[in-house]
Design a protein with these regions (language model features):
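A short, Lys/Arg-rich alpha-helix, primarily the initiator
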Residues: 1-18
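Phosphate-coordinating loops and pocket residues in cytosolic domains that bind phosphorylated ligands
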Residues: 22, 36, 63
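DNA major-groove recognition helix of helix-turn-helix/homeodomain DNA-binding modules
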Residues: 45-60
């Protein structure tokens, strides 16, 4: 399972979805789905834009969690 930490990162920085969308040019719906961990696919350019904007590495944004067998 892949866990997205966008909501945690945005919460720590007190960022709003609308502000991130406006500042990055990423569709608000895309950010909302990532924030709520409902996104099933995310374009690499979106990930790159978010990492650049937030000044984080991809490993800070996403984490692979092993599920029990």
């Amino acid at each position: 399972m892949v866990k997205c930490h966008l909501s945690t990162i945005m919460g720590e920085r007190r960022l709003k979805i609308a502000d991130v969308s406006r500042d990055t040019g990423i569709n608000r719906g895309t950010i909302t789905r990532m924030y709520n961990e409902e996104a099933t696919r995310v374009d690499l350019d979106v990930i790159e834009s978010l990492c650049t904007y937030l000044k984080i590495d991809i490993g800070d944004l996403y984490q692979v969690i092993e599920e029990p067998a």
